[in-house]
UniProtKB/Swiss-Prot annotation:
This is Type II secretion system protein L. The chain crosses the membrane at residues 248-264. It is a single-pass membrane protein. It is found in: Cell inner membrane. Inner membrane component of the type II secretion system required for the energy-dependent secretion of extracellular factors such as proteases and toxins from the periplasm. Plays a role in the complex assembly and recruits OutM resulting in a stable complex in the inner membrane. Provides thus a link between the energy-providing OutE protein in the cytoplasm and the rest of the T2SS machinery. Residues 1-247 are cytoplasmic. Residues 265-399 are periplasmic. Pfam families: GspL_C, T2SSL. Keywords: Cell inner membrane, Cell membrane, Membrane, Protein transport, Transmembrane, Transmembrane helix, Transport. Disulfide bonds: none annotated. The keyword Transmembrane helix applies. One of its GO terms (cellular component) is plasma membrane.
């Protein structure tokens, strides 16, 4: 079969890293559509990159040696599981040999209330992840190689790989032992049924043979749960959409800051408008009360003022209010030394009441004489202050 035929469809890389980054890598290119191996090999990272040039892959399943990982089983009740997950390092502090600050803890599996926890040195995990990043292939998952073995109820799974025996126990934890002493390890604990995916050793009379395969092929075929990924917590992979946004991070930050400024300015502007509207509403009420002091309830000054104007136009009031207000405005404008302090309208008496301030008696008298051309003005009060004169005038319409 030609290479073009082999590489048609989707391919996935199954990669096993070594304990030492200087050691050779192992890989297998798996055809997802045909469920078969396209090529296998071992060597350096550079040699693998050369292979990937001929066999492009969509993703990689990465296995790391279980000899660098320890497994523990903890009881995590469902009611408080979220809180206990954060406390796992302290729960295992007495069982690990290193400082927990130097260790990474990842939950591999949950079975009822029991959790399988993998512990690995942070420095070792960072080295593996750096290799994956250098390779440049999207990583589907990073798991201890023993987790590629199927988990069976009341039975172990076993496979031989490079002078190591890998065991996955029915509890979910894993073990790795060299071929020359694995029997001694197993002799110290009761042994259930063992499903063996390698040729069964002659001494293992109770082991149950399974279809013989190799570790990388088994890892390609098995359904690896995403929960078994060692990349948890601070090492959790960045989601693709977040990765795509990283180049735009500074632009998005600047845009967010600008939007916040615009929003803040808009909120402040609307608040100022509200303050101004409230001020003028109160001012209109104040002016209306001065014009119509007999009215105790002012709900809508504008509507109430329009009602009064309509009554005036209809002849309800004998005092032509609008015309007289225009004349009063002209009088104030003609006498610059006189200022109007307050104005009120007594509807029952049909008269305007003014409170005036002038710089002298002469100016106040001049204003009064000019106003007499349009109004009846009974004697009013005037008093001299330190630097001005204050007066009260009542204006009534001419008969």
């Amino acid at each position: 079969m030609s290479k073009a035929e082999n590489t048609s469809g989707k391919q996935q890389l199954i990669l096993r890293l070594s304990a030492d980054t200087s050691d050779s890598l192992e890989w297998l290119i798996w055809s997802v559509s045909r469920h078969q191996t396209l090529t296998t090999g071992s060597g350096t990272l550079e040699s693998l990159q050369a292979v990937l040039a001929d066999y492009p892959v969509i993703s990689a399943r990465v296995l790391v040696p279980s000899t660098d990982v320890t497994f523990h089983t903890l009881s995590l009740p469902r009611q408080s599981r979220r809180q206990l997950l954060q406390a796992i390092p302290f729960m295992l502090e007495e069982q690990v040999a290193s400082d927990i600050d130097q260790l990474h803890f990842a939950v591999m599996d949950m079975h009822g209330d029991n959790a399988t926890v993998a512990v690995v040195q942070k420095s070792r995990l960072r080295a593996w992840l750096n290799q994956c990043e250098t390779l440049g292939v999207p990583v589907e998952t990073v798991v201890p190689d023993v987790m590629a073995l199927p988990r069976a109820d009341s039975a172990w799974s076993a496979i031989s790989h490079r002078n190591l025996w890998l065991f996955r126990l029915d509890s979910g934890i894993g073990m790795a032992a060299e071929e020359n002493w694995y029997q001694s390890l197993l002799a110290f604990q009761p042994l259930p049924a063992v499903h063996c995916y390698s040729p069964v050793p002659a001494s293992a009379l109770t082991w149950q043979p399974q279809p013989v395969t190799d570790l990388l092929t088994l890892a390609a075929q098995v359904n690896l749960s995403m929960s078994m990924d060692l990349r948890q917590g601070e090492y959790a992979p960045v989601k693709p959409w977040k990765q795509a946004l990283l180049p735009w991070r500074n632009v998005l930050i600047a845009l967010s800051a600008w939007l916040l400024l615009v929003l803040g300015e808009s909120v402040w502007t609307h608040y100022q408008w509200y303050r101004q509207a409230d001020y003028w509403r109160q001012e209109s009420v104040r002016v209306y009360r001065k014009l119509f002091p007999d009215e105790k309830q002012v709900v809508n000054p504008r509507a109430q003022m329009q009602r009064h104007l309509q009554e005036v136009r209809a002849g309800v009031s004998g005092f032509a209010l609008t015309e007289q207000m225009n004349r009063l405005q002209q009088l104030v404008a003609q006498n610059e030394g006189v200022s109007l302090q307050s104005l009120s309208y007594d509807r029952s008496r049909d008269e305007l009441r003014l409170s005036l301030r002038a710089t002298s008696y002469a100016q106040m008298e001049q204003f009064r004489q000019q106003a007499q051309a349009y109004f009846q003005i009974p004697p009013g009060e005037m008093k001299q202050e330190k630097d001005h004169v204050e007066g009260q005038l009542t204006l009534r319409s001419q008969p």
